[in-house]
Amino acid sequence: MVSVKKIVASALVGVLMFSAVGCNMVEKTQAAIDKTTVATVNGEKITLGEVDSHLKGVFAQMKSQYGDKYMDDPQVAQQILQQRQSVVQGLVTDKVLGIEADKLGIKPSEEEIKKKVDEQFENIKKGMGDNFDKALEAEGYTEDTFKDVIKNQVINQAVQDYIIKDVKVTDEDAQKYYDENKQQFVAKDSGVLTKHLLFENEEEAQKAYDEIQSGKTTFNDLFTKYENNKSENKKPIAENLGVVPAENSGLVQEFVDGLKPLKEGEISKPIKTQFGYHIIQAGATYEKGAQLPFDDVKSQIIQILKQQKDSEKFKADMDQWKKDLNVKVYDDKLQEGLKISK
């Protein structure tokens, strides 16, 4: 399960105003430091206090390791500066995407947002179990402020889906990539070519399995239907895992146990892991060093190229939007309260 810290690092959003910075060479009150403008988006300010509100866990860790005057340590100060730079870029991205969601008319309704926020929150909480509250507290979030993080993720995802909706990868693109990168598609170990479908819940997985068994659809049809979902961060996910060795595959044990008895072309019943419910398909067996045929890795290549094209399209649109919204980031202001070595 993804940790709260990782989710917070990917989202980089929130509303809680908190600061734990010290004084620098120029005497300023803490309130003045917190109000320092470190970026603007369409004239709207982002303050250092907003940035530091996402670093409470970092500050607590630094204080525990280096003592109360941790910000006076140039090495620690440099680490905090890097964290601030990462956070402010995330906050800028969130504001830009929020503005564009409204402009494009693609912002989900409040009801849709609440439903998705509640679902994701409960999934994260359930996945982390007893560690959730402690992890949330360690990162400086309450349940409400963490839900604000997820809310921004939901809005951002809507814009990202809009940006990449027309991105396509053709069979010709995939063939060209294969021909130019054949060395990437050599079996690193002896094992079974493995694909799987990953569903959010047991009901969806069982329905898909039953439809495959009844002949209403096929595993390959569903794989094609869902193969772009991974890049769009939504389930069901269709994924080609390549050649999976019998030992030391790095996969969770439940998945390995589900794959083991399958013969070529067979599929498993829905298998529960910490990630959801899988339907696994076993493909051909390959020896270490064997060149994998194009048809066996085509779906894998399409996913690689789709992710590349999605990233390029997203970056191009974001760069233009930042220009249109006159985004400015004041890197020097991110050094407030820190003793940075020159």
Curated annotation (Swiss-Prot):
- Name-wise, this protein is Foldase protein PrsA
What is the residue range of the signal peptide feature? Answer: 1-22
User: A Gene Ontology MF term for this entry?
Assistant: peptidyl-prolyl cis-trans isomerase activity
Coiled coil spans: none
The taxonomy runs:
Bacteria, Bacillati, Bacillota, Clostridia, Eubacteriales
Its function, per the record, reads: Plays a major role in protein secretion by helping the post-translocational extracellular folding of several secreted proteins.
* Pfam families listed in its UniProt record: Rotamase_2, SurA_N_3
Domain PpiC stretches: 189-284
Please give, as recorded in its UniProt entry, the membrane topology of this protein: Lipid-anchor
Lipidation sites, kind N-palmitoyl cysteine, are 23
Listed under GO biological process in this entry are:
protein folding
EC number(s) stated in the UniProt entry for this protein? 5.2.1.8
Q: Which family does it belong to?
A: Belongs to the PrsA family.
**Which class of enzymes does this protein belong to?**
isomerase
- List the S-diacylglycerol cysteine lipid attachment residues: 23
Task: Give the main localization category.
Answer: membrane
Q: Does the keyword Lipoprotein apply?
A: yes
Which organism was this protein described from? Clostridium perfringens (strain ATCC 13124 / DSM 756 / JCM 1290 / NCIMB 6125 / NCTC 8237 / Type A)
UniProt-annotated location(s):
Cell membrane
From the UniProt record, list the reaction(s) this protein catalyses. [protein]-peptidylproline (omega=180) = [protein]-peptidylproline (omega=0)
This protein's GO CC annotations? plasma membrane
Q: Which InterPro entries match?
A: Foldase_PrsA, PPIase_dom_sf, PPIase_PpiC, PrsA_foldase, Trigger_fact/SurA_dom_sf
Keyword line: Cell membrane, Isomerase, Lipoprotein, Membrane, Palmitate, Rotamase, Signal
